[in-house]
Design a protein with these regions (language model features):
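Single conserved hydrophobic/aromatic residue that forms the stacking wall/gate
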Residues: 1-11
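Alpha/beta-hydrolase
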Residues: 8, 20-22, 55
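Low-complexity, intrinsically disordered or weakly predicted helical/coil tracts enriched
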Residues: 10-13, 28
Length: 220
């Protein structure tokens, strides 16, 4: 109904949202949670993890880009380095699609703060102070006692900048997929895509297929 009222082209298939959710979760688990646990424990050094959540693109030709693209991979670089498109100093097809002029001030506020964290870290390995004092402390990853582990970067129009602790495990992801109200074939397709490229051994992947939904999925 909202799509028709706003004359937007919407992704109506709920499977798209479910598929995107678990692809993102598997990426976070394998590329952030696991290595952060290992590095912070083994090396006894501070690890700073983040999630970029900005999704305030324009609706372009009726396409809901905030839903279709969201905070896509690498998009935070424009904010860290304050790109010309973000500043409104470069107008081309991509920038006009990506950045909503009505959100310019909040985009720039987020960009400035992100850049300051990065400068601080480059200065002395601590993103929180010198030369810039930051109002939200970016705490190092700590897997003990359910501590806050990573910072989320978003504009004040949404979550803003804040620390979070929702970490993932392989079991939590697989259980989530299993509990979704989609077909078995769709669940198996998600599993196939998740393990299409993996650092797990063939034996480990085979064991996952054997145990997931009582072996209803066949490895592609």
């Amino acid at each position: 109904e909202d799509c028709r009222r706003q004359r937007q082209m919407c992704i109506r298939d709920r499977y798209y949202d479910i598929y995107a959710k678990y692809m993102a979760e598997s990426w976070k688990y394998g590329a952030v949670d696991l290595p952060s646990d290992f590095t912070s424990n083994y090396k006894k050094s501070n690890v700073y993890a983040y999630r970029f959540d900005w999704d305030e693109q324009n609706v372009y030709l009726g396409v809901d880009l905030p839903n279709l693209l969201g905070a896509a991979h690498g998009m935070e670089l424009a904010f860290i380095f304050k790109s010309d498109g973000l500043l409104g100093e470069s107008s081309d097809a991509i920038n006009d699609i990506m950045y909503n002029e009505n959100n310019r001030s909040t985009d720039l506020e987020l960009s400035t703060k992100m850049g300051q964290y990065w400068v601080n870290f480059a200065y002395d390995g601590n993103p929180n102070s010198a030369p810039y004092d930051m109002s939200t402390e970016w705490k190092p990853w700590n897997k003990l006692n359910n501590n806050e582990r990573f910072i989320v970067f978003d504009s004040v129009n949404d979550k803003g900048i804040a620390m979070f602790n929702n970490t993932l495990s392989a079991n939590s992801i697989l259980q989530g997929i299993s509990s979704e109200s989609i077909t078995v074939d769709q669940k198996c397709n998600i599993i196939d895509k998740m393990f299409n490229r993996t650092t797990l051994t063939d034996e480990e992947v085979d064991e996952i297929y054997r145990t997931f939904m009582s072996g209803k999925c066949t490895r592609a």
